[in-house]
């Protein structure tokens, strides 16, 4: 990098925009000396951190930089024992410690901004220093009265003494003989002594010491003799106060020295946060983004804007160097924006390599160039003197001596300022040299010979700045792939110059130049046609995308409606099945009560089968709406199961896999039910417990059903009573607990219909009370 390139690309002017946001004076020098990074890893780390800070500023309130100071320079002042900081300096240290601590806490709470959290995560906690300073200094940056016991006593004495002095003056003011002596009845101070303004002509009336006179000489400031001793005492107290404050400041200085290393770490973080904040404010205000910077030798800018042109008026530039070609040659007349395009490329590259976001799309890519070299002349001058051409040659010579494959070269109006033929030849020779070195270059020229040369050479792409011949003004659009036209005669014709002059001028143009201009015109026409095709294609793509979006939305609506229908169908089916289960349960209960009436039993069996068939039909209707999931069979013939539709236990008689149903028997009832109405029941071993210290006798036994569901409890009770009857028990205890009473009600309902039960009663005293039912067996 060289200073000349920085100057012509106005990098220092860009830094001034960032300096406007700097708070700490020391950092102004840091920004002024800012230049491209030497290490790619360090640069990318900086860009990531700046990106985090930009997002923090945009979405989470940013960072409060007001009050930040270079506290490291303050620490230098107290290196030696016996030195201390003034009150305001201590307050500045306190503000910085608190700012960083609160900022770290905020980042931890947000839980994002990884780069920022890693940067600030290792700072030490110096809350103890904050507390000491806060207890010593108030927000008005004054030492508090209670900073020490001695200081409190001194200030209390001063307050009392001050009241006495005021009282003495008031007595003087009230003296009738002195009513005309005072210029004003006020107390003021001169040389640290309390005095009052007295008219010059009456000064002899008041005995005291004259300390000062007004500029007119009409007023003298006198310390009355009655106040002198009090003033002397006040001076003594003030001296003691200053000494006590000095001791307090020395103690705090010692505390700071003991924590010097930690304070210096925080000081460095504070200064870095100030720089990050300044860069980020500039970036957010100017709609800047972080480009990709890599070792690839490429310069690809998308929607790039020059930082010094109004962001709402500038025409963005898009181009790429380093992929299909190494040199971009912009041709065409002056005033078309060629130099602005060249400066945009150079300045944005310097910004990115220096860790500054650029006014361009985040899709932009910039190579980690070893050097950025620029030679930019005054493109608007009508004549260039030999001296300016010599300076131009000197700059080009220095650039060619320094460039490598990994350099970016920016040359404005190469070869201008001398004979056009020699200037064009010189320009082509320089371009050849840069092309051989594979050096990434951005070059502007208005020579026709160079246009034709660039169009035909390998590794070079021509471009031009669009010019509106109707309005006779540039549009500042960069047209890559299209060489620039001079437009001089076209402009002259539109401005009304005689046609004879225009025709004669065309005759003077050489055939070669005419061919070049014709070639450019054809290329421009084809390019415009291609642009129109691209626009049509883009419109069609957008229409197709919108159609896809509409179709997607319609599909979502249909899917939602379908789900609502399915939900409604399920709810209706569930309602009907619950009704059928209730009817089935009632039929079963009726069968058990009227078991002896065979005709009624047959009719009930028939009704139950009809209900079972209806239940299956309802299930099938629901399946038509939603594809049925095949039920997994986990039972076999002979298994004991619970049938949900009739709310009863039964045994499997037959399994019909194709129909996904099974024939079951519950008591004398036989019916076919779907698989999903069947629940396998595993037999459990009985547990035997004592109830409320009830003594077990040879003829008594218990079953504990507490904590079980009603269905499960009834099944276990039924099995238990079978065994109890076989074992000859005449009385058993069924423990169900008190609870909500639901389990007890279910068990009593079962006992009422059970064929083994003769009678039952609630447990008595010592038998469990309401928590136990005593059952007498037949």
Swiss-Prot record:
Ranges annotated as spanning the membrane: none
GO molecular function: ATP binding; ATP hydrolysis activity; ATP-dependent DNA damage sensor activity; double-stranded DNA binding; endonuclease activity; mismatched DNA binding; ribosomal large subunit binding; rRNA binding
SMART domains with a match to the protein in the record: MUTSac (SM00534), MUTSd (SM00533), SMR (SM00463)
InterPro entries: DNA_mismatch_repair_MutS_C, DNA_mismatch_repair_MutS_core, DNA_mismatch_repair_MutS_sf, MSSS, MutS, MutS2, P-loop_NTPase, Smr_dom
Keywords recorded for this protein, A-Z: ATP-binding, DNA-binding, Endonuclease, Hydrolase, Nuclease, Nucleotide-binding, RNA-binding, rRNA-binding
Gene3D superfamilies: 3.30.1370.110, P-loop containing nucleotide triphosphate hydrolases
Domain (Smr): residue spans on this chain: 703-778
Pfam families attached to this UniProt entry: MSSS (PF20297), MutS_V (PF00488), Smr (PF01713)
Enzyme Commission identifier(s): 3.1.-.-, 3.6.4.-
GO biological process terms on file: mismatch repair; negative regulation of DNA recombination; rescue of stalled ribosome
Task performed by this protein: Endonuclease that is involved in the suppression of homologous recombination and thus may have a key role in the control of bacterial genetic diversity. Acts as a ribosome collision sensor, splitting the ribosome into its 2 subunits. Detects stalled/collided 70S ribosomes which it binds and splits by an ATP-hydrolysis driven conformational change. Acts upstream of the ribosome quality control system (RQC), a ribosome-associated complex that mediates the extraction of incompletely synthesized nascent chains from stalled ribosomes and their subsequent degradation. Probably generates substrates for RQC.
Quaternary structure and interacting proteins, as annotated: Homodimer. Binds to stalled ribosomes, contacting rRNA.
Family label: Belongs to the DNA mismatch repair MutS family. MutS2 subfamily.
UniProt xrefs under HAMAP family: MutS2
Protein name: Endonuclease MutS2
Organism: Fusobacterium nucleatum subsp. nucleatum (strain ATCC 25586 / DSM 15643 / BCRC 10681 / CIP 101130 / JCM 8532 / KCTC 2640 / LMG 13131 / VPI 4355)
């Amino acid at each position: 990098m060289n200073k000349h390139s920085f100057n012509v690309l106005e990098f220092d002017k860009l830094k001034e925009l960032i300096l406007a946001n700097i708070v700490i004076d020391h950092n102004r020098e840091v920004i002024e000396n800012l230049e491209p990074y030497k290490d790619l890893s360090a640069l990318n780390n900086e860009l990531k951190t700046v990106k985090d800070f930009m997002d923090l500023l945009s979405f989470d309130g940013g960072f409060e930089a007001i009050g930040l100071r270079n506290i490291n320079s303050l620490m230098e002042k107290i290196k030696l024992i016996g030195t201390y900081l003034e009150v305001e300096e201590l307050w500045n240290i306190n503000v910085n410690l608190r700012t960083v601590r609160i900022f770290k806490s905020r980042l931890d709470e947000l839980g994002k901004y990884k780069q920022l959290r890693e940067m600030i995560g290792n700072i030490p906690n110096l809350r103890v220093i904050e507390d000491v300073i806060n207890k010593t200094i108030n927000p008005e940056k004054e030492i508090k009265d209670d900073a020490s016991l001695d200081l409190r006593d001194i200030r209390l004495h001063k307050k009392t003494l001050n009241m006495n002095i005021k009282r003495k003056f008031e007595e003087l003011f009230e003296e009738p003989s002195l009513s005309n002596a005072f210029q004003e009845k006020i107390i003021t101070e001169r040389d640290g002594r309390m005095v009052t303004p007295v008219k010059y002509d009456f000064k002899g009336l008041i005995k005291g010491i004259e300390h000062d006179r007004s500029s007119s000489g009409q007023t003298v400031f006198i310390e009355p003799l009655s106040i002198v001793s009090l003033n002397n005492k006040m001076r003594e107290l003030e001296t003691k106060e200053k000494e006590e404050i000095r001791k307090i400041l020395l103690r705090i200085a010692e505390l700071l020295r003991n924590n010097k290393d930690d304070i210096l770490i925080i000081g460095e973080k504070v200064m870095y946060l100030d720089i990050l904040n300044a860069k980020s404010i500039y970036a957010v205000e100017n709609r800047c983004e972080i480009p990709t910077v890599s070792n690839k030798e490429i310069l690809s800018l998308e929607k790039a804007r020059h930082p010094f042109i109004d962001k709402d008026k500038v025409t963005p530039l898009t181009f790429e160097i380093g992929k299909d070609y190494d040199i971009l040659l912009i041709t065409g007349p002056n005033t078309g924006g060629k130099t602005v395009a060249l400066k945009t490329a150079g300045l944005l590259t310097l910004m990115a390599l220096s860790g500054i976001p650029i006014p361009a799309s985040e899709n932009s890519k910039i190579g980690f160039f070893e050097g950025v070299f620029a030679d930019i002349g005054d493109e608007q001058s009508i004549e260039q003197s030999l001296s300016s051409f010599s300076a131009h040659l000197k700059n080009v010579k220095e650039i060619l001596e320094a460039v490598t494959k990994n350099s970016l070269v920016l040359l404005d109006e190469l070869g201008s300022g001398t004979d056009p033929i020699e200037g064009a030849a010189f320009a082509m020779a320089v371009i050849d040299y840069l092309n051989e070195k594979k050096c990434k270059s951005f070059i502007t020229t208005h020579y026709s010979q160079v246009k034709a040369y660039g169009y035909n050479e390998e590794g070079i792409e021509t471009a031009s700045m669009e010019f509106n011949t109707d309005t006779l003004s540039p549009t500042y659009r960069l047209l890559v792939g299209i060489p620039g036209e001079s437009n001089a005669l076209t402009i002259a014709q539109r401005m009304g110059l005689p046609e004879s002059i225009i025709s004669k001028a065309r005759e003077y143009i050489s055939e070669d130049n005419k061919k070049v201009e014709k070639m450019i015109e054809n290329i421009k026409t084809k390019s415009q046609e291609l642009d129109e095709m691209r626009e049509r294609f883009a419109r069609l793509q957008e229409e197709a995308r919108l159609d896809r979006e509409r179709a997607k939305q319609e599909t979502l609506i249909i899917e939602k409606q379908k789900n609502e229908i399915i939900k409604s169908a399920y709810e209706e089916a569930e309602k009907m099945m619950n009704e059928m289960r209730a009817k089935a349960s009632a039929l079963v209960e009726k069968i058990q009560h009227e078991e002896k009436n065979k005709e009624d039993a047959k009719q009930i069996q028939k009704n139950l089968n009809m209900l079972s068939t209806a239940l299956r039909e309802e299930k099938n209707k629901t399946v038509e709406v939603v594809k049925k999931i095949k039920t997994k069979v986990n039972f076999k013939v002979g298994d004991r199961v619970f049938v949900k539709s009739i709310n009863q236990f039964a045994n499997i008689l037959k399994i019909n896999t194709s129909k996904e149903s099974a024939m079951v028997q519950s008591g004398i009832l036989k019916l076919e039910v779907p698989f999903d109405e069947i629940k396998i029941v595993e037999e459990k071993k009985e547990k035997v417990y004592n109830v409320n210290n009830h003594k077990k006798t040879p003829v008594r036994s218990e079953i504990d059903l507490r904590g079980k569901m009603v269905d499960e409890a009834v099944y276990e009770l039924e099995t238990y009573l079978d065994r109890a009857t076989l074992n000859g028990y005449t009385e058993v205890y069924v423990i169900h607990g008190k609870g909500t009473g639901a389990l007890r009600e279910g068990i009593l309902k079962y006992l009422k219909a059970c064929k083994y039960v003769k009678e039952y009663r609630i447990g008595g005293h010592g038998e469990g009370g309401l928590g136990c039912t005593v059952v007498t067996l037949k």
